[in-house]
Amino acid sequence: MASRILVTGGTGTLGRHVVSRLRDAGCDVRVLSRRSRAPGDGVEFMTGDLATGEGIEPAVEGAGTIVHCAGSAKGDEDKARNLVRAASRAGARHLVHLGRRRRPHPDR
């Protein structure tokens, strides 16, 4: 069996599609989320916060690949930095950073 894949932002707009595709392909999927969730549909959920670094280390442990889909209006560089550090310490072999283009808010 292939190594575990961790998806950050796996409950968001982009991430939930990534999780679905990986799960359908038979991958061992773990999701890092700020809110606790029960495991379901072959997906393990772990609670953590990329901004504070809390819970990242246990989430990346055992993941050979990390797909980073988490994004927000601010603080993305620090969040990515926290994830990269934890991934490096855990020996993750691959880190994929996905994002989506945001449309400017028409009222701003």
What does each of the following model-derived ranges do?
Residues 44, 53, 61-104:
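NAD(P)-cofactor binding segment of oxidoreductase domains
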Residues 41-49:
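Active-site regions of enzymes building and remodeling cell-envelope glycoconjugates
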Residues 31-37, 49-50:
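N-terminal Rossmann-fold cofactor-binding loop
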Residues 11, 36, 102:
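Short, glycine/serine-rich, charged loops/turns that create anion-binding
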Residues 26-28, 42, 92:
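A generic structural signal for alpha->beta connector loops
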